[in-house]
Amino acid sequence: MMKTAVMFILVVVISLTYSSEEQEVARTYCGRHLANILAYVCFGVEKRGGAQYAPYWQETYLRSRKGPGVVDECCFRPCKLEVLKSYCGV
């Protein structure tokens, strides 16, 4: 009986962990927060302000895309990190 209860709890915990990883929450990112999250997603840095990361925000460092831009996709409506990653340079 005890083994069955432990096994049941283990299955529930694993399934909850797996499902939470699959369901990333879409969020809105605007202004400085959008710049900071792009720096983190694309370059693995936390932008502290100032000019030390300014070259990263030049157009040559971001992938050019046709259609809506990152502000349209992630500020005006919620987006997931995968959308933000699609704007990183290759």
Curated annotation (Swiss-Prot):
GO terms for cellular component: extracellular space. Pfam families: Insulin. Disulfide bonds join C30-C75, C42-C88, C74-C79. One of its GO terms (biological process) is positive regulation of cell population proliferation. Residues 1-20 form the signal peptide. CDD domains: IlGF_insulin_bombyxin_like. Its main location: secreted. GO terms for molecular function: growth factor activity; hormone activity; insulin-like growth factor receptor binding. Residues 49-64 form a propeptide. InterPro entries: Bombyxin, Bombyxin_B, Insulin-like, Insulin-like_sf, Insulin_CS, Insulin_family. Keywords: Cleavage on pair of basic residues, Disulfide bond, Hormone, Secreted, Signal. Gene3D superfamilies: Insulin-like (1.10.100.10). Brain peptide responsible for activation of prothoracic glands to produce ecdysone in insects. Belongs to the insulin family. Heterodimer of a B chain and an A chain linked by two disulfide bonds. This is Bombyxin B-5.
